[in-house]
């Protein structure tokens, strides 16, 4: 759920997706349970998933309600099901993930099913 970028521009796609460029992606994540500081510390160090240490993660708790915790998470890589695996490993099953940012591009006020074109300035920010 959340921000998806569609493009037919190969250079733009490469700049956004290739791990070498380390484009940050922001997510809101809801997990079951009250997340402890030790668990966040483990994520920030770079979680080990499938025998591979991943890059450090920026993460903070936004709020906790009824045994559910909402977090803000930033990754610079994005392997298959990485977020779910990270939280499963530290004991907090993921209930919802919503991407709100890819590099300089923000979801903003767009609602589900809505779209908009990138501005020339946004394209320039990605390519430079």
Whereabouts are the PLM-identified features?
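Basic, flexible Lys/Arg- and Gly-enriched helix-loop patches that mediate nucleic-acid binding at interfaces
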Residues: 1-128
């Amino acid at each position: 759920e959340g921000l998806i970028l569609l493009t037919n521009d190969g250079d733009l796609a490469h700049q956004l997706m290739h791990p070498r460029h380390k484009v940050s992606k922001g997510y809101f994540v809801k997990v079951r349970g009250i997340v402890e500081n030790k668990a966040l510390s483990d994520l920030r160090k770079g979680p080990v998933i499938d025998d591979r240490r991943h890059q450090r993660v920026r993460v903070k708790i936004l709020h906790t309600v009824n045994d559910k915790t909402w977090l803000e998470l930033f990754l610079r890589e994005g392997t298959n099901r990485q977020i779910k695996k990270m939280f499963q490993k530290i004991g907090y099953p993921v209930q919802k993930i919503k991407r709100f940012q890819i590099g300089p591009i923000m979801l903003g006020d767009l609602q589900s099913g809505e779209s908009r074109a990138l501005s020339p300035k946004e394209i320039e920010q990605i390519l430079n």
